Amino acid sequence: MIMIRFLSFILFFSYLNSGQDYIDYPHPFHPTSSKSGMVVSQNILSSDIGVEILDMGGNAVDAAVAVGFSLATTLPRAGNLGGGGFMLIYIKEKDEIFYIDYRSKSPKNASIEKLLGTKKIPDRNSKRWERVDYTYLASAVPGTVYGLLEAHKNFGRLELQEIMKPVIAQAEEGIVVSSDLSYVIGVTPQLKSDKESYSIYYKDDEPLEEFSIMRRPDLANTFKEISKNGIKGFYEGKIADKRVNAMNQNNGLITHED
């Protein structure tokens, strides 16, 4: 018992003299509190853009919209223009909660037979499912852009062009590839078989490494169309034409009607 107490005293004394907190509160895996607002996402570069929007006088919705678009650059598996999502918005002054559902939808001409090549749903172990896991048949009609812009239109404070400016700059100037993004690229070999994905996520025939620089000029151009023309900039015009052309060339189902 005396020895245990003596060791406890030594450990406690060492802790007091270490000059460091035993719990690293700023660490991402520990709770963090703030009195002036907070921006949280799965990538710090995107979160920084959210903070920038708040510093510009934007509200929480402005920041959320900017972060959502930014994640298409920094961590596309967590946020992307080709997907969808949901959003809850609380208006303190009215004590009201609004819900926006912008989940992706199936193309109008989709069917079990077109998707899986059979009229009956096959066993989940069937290789037929690879058709809707890794090919253009897996693509649903994207809702992300519609949902984010709908939130901004109804609840945002800043002009859309103000929100999109740092997002565009980030895609043009490039980002430092995170360990998360590098890992996901490395464990997704299907990216290598797609010409566009290969040109973005590979260098010298190898997946982009952590700390390397990734630039997205094409994505920046899409952001510019959205910034200039809003929803129509993504669901109509040249961006929509490119998307439909890609579908036609790769046996996808999304059409202009969708």
Predicted features by range, described:
Residues Q20-D48, A60-N229, F234-E236, A240-D258:
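Noncatalytic scaffold domains of N-terminal-nucleophile
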Residues M1-F9:
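Sec-dependent signal peptide recognition
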Residues E52-L54:
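Long, structured ligand/cofactor-binding scaffold of large enzymes
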Residues F9-S18:
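Hydrophobic h-region of N-terminal signal peptides that target proteins for export
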